[in-house]
């Protein structure tokens, strides 16, 4: 068995999860950061991280870390950590292609006595049933005799500068007791928050997938409550704050649920459940409800426009924010894009503004042309403005600057509860429509949208519907 102090690591995948891991290990161990994207490697070698997870100073501190796209360079490692995405396909079925390809990569370079650790979120059993057989086939080695494996689910929270890799407790597991001990000690060398050693790889896999599934289901509950209270003319936030005065009331809030984990991971669990012959009811119902919240937001905005006798078809709508959370460039599976198709169904012309998102990446991923320059916006140009992401730049604009984008009777819909209540009133105060314009969601922590992948359960959006007079 490898001794921790003799470990040479290879991190497979240098995205939001892999890079912070490589940087932390690279401060203490000889570490190879491997990615198939040459431009990503070039960027990191220049001391820049486009994901903004690691600063130039942090990259420089990892003096034992080198980056490469050269597969042969991985042969010097004796411990491989796989940190690739695990998405779903268009039918919401698990897509293990990145994981299988990463396993093939490991299989080409792994040697006797080596250890491979998976961090990607999967359904219980995926590591041993789907990944390890690939490593065995490609390498010609036998699992738990020639090489060993473990699973330690990632808990990276993109954009969160408070909860960083070393300060988040790590779940670890291994294919044998000795391997489990080695993996646990390896992570303890960089995780100041400590570790939790799970009794099996499957238990660790299941623990990870239910973290996000639990959040998704709870958000679905409060999303449904917000729809009910809206019909009853009750302020949802008032209800949640009152209920929250009890010590054991869970502080979930409604919101758009997208991103690359909370809106994806439940499908991994339901897929495996269905393979066992069980059809999960609550989890899938929650997914359906959460996926429809974008449609609900647009329908509410359209109602406000009609109430103000605004022409909906042909109207100009500005959506402020596109990333799946505030102050973060990550656009993966952002549910803000759902607003586009819904508004276009009503014949609206939609513009996007996001100072954090890369316009080229946005166009490539979603076919959307957007601007990142706030100064390009024209006064009074839009019939409706949707504040969808609480970027600091939007907060700095202030109420007057944002309202200047609208005509006198324009609709300002504050999803993120960034602005004070009165900001959502029409410029010409009219009590008959004042209350209809205050339909807002607020986020309760620095996390951003409820779409976030690994935020605490309380870091979701708050929906506020104000009752009619």
What are the roles of these predicted feature ranges?
Residues 433-434, 455:
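Intrinsically disordered, low-complexity regions enriched in Ser/Pro/Gly/Gln/His and often acidic
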Residues 442-445, 450-459, 465-469:
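A cross-taxon signal for low-complexity, glycine/charged-rich
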Residues 8, 70, 446, 460-461:
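N-terminal compositionally biased, intrinsically disordered segments and leader/signal-like regions
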